[in-house]
């Protein structure tokens, strides 16, 4: 079995992973369940690899996954999540060959006891 179903249909799962990947790119650290974090790892690693290539085809491939979210910077300028991926995040990892994310276990969630985890960019 190549992936986790996460209790959703395929289109719901794809939408959830797109949302989580965009949130991780924008915030660089999010808290979610352990299964979602482990599944998100592969999605974000492939996006960063596309960002490292940096050509137009890679940008279009990444634009299929990353949501069109605007980010307000400290100097009151805005950029999209895709611009942050290609302009800030991908250049950090030019010397690293994969393994761009880290999953830390955070214990059970208070409401339902699900194992939560923090996923962050290394």
UniProtKB/Swiss-Prot annotation:
GO terms for biological process: translation. InterPro entries: Ribosomal_bL17, Ribosomal_bL17_CS, Ribosomal_bL17_sf. Keywords: Ribonucleoprotein, Ribosomal protein. One of its GO terms (molecular function) is structural constituent of ribosome. One of its GO terms (cellular component) is cytosolic large ribosomal subunit. HAMAP family: Ribosomal_bL17 (MF_01368). Belongs to the bacterial ribosomal protein bL17 family. Part of the 50S ribosomal subunit. Contacts protein L32. This is Large ribosomal subunit protein bL17. It comes from Staphylococcus carnosus (strain TM300).
């Amino acid at each position: 079995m190549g992936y986790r179903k996460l209790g959703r249909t395929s289109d719901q799962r794809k939408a959830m992973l797109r949302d989580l990947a965009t949130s991780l790119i924008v915030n660089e650290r999010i808290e979610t369940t352990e299964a979602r974090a482990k599944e998100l790892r592969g999605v974000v690693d492939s996006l960063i690899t596309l960002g490292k290539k940096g050509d137009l085809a890679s940008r279009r491939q990444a634009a299929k996954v990353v949501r069109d979210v605007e980010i307000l910077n400290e100097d009151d300028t805005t950029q999209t999540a895709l611009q942050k991926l290609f302009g800030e995040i991908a250049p950090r990892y030019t010397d690293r060959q994969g393994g761009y994310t880290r999953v830390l276990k955070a214990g059970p969630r208070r409401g339902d006891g699900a194992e939560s985890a923090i996923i962050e960019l290394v």
